[in-house]
Amino acid sequence: MFPISAALLDAMVLSLVAREETYGYKITQDMQTAAKVSESTLYPVLRRLQKNGALETFDRAYMGRNRRYYRITALGAAMLRQYRIDWEEHKGQIDSILKEKEETQHDNG
């Protein structure tokens, strides 16, 4: 598995929260398919995105206590749109290098 940059982590969190209002532990679980991210890594990201105005929080009762939920803001949605554009460009550049390498190996083999 490849290391996840801070920007990619932000993009992934914003994307998950854009799908549904959700809470930290669920975000961690949802991210496990793509990245090994612990709660201790995720919560500072959530706090930073909240402080920057990309996310907002609210509490919802759950089993007799409050659970903190996150929702994306208009600013967060705009950031996510840009992250998606940047990701497609970056992914295309990486794909072109990886595919070129595979073709070169087959040609030389």
What are the residue ranges of the model-derived segments?
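Amphipathic alpha-helical dimerization/coiled-coil segments
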Residues: 79-109
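N-terminal helix-turn-helix DNA-binding core of bacterial DNA-binding proteins
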Residues: 1-43
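Basic, amphipathic "hinge/linker" alpha-helix immediately C-terminal to the N-terminal HTH DNA-binding motif
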Residues: 62-84
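Glycine-centered, phosphate/nucleic-acid-interacting loop/turn motifs that mediate DNA/RNA or nucleotide
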Residues: 53
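Short, hydrophobic-biased segments on the C-terminal half of alpha helices
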Residues: 46-49
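Generic recognition of well-ordered alpha-helical segments
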Residues: 29, 74, 89-92
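Proline- and acidic/polar-enriched loop/turn elements at helix boundaries
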Residues: 43-44, 61
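Short beta-strand "wing" residues that participate in macromolecule-binding interfaces
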Residues: 57
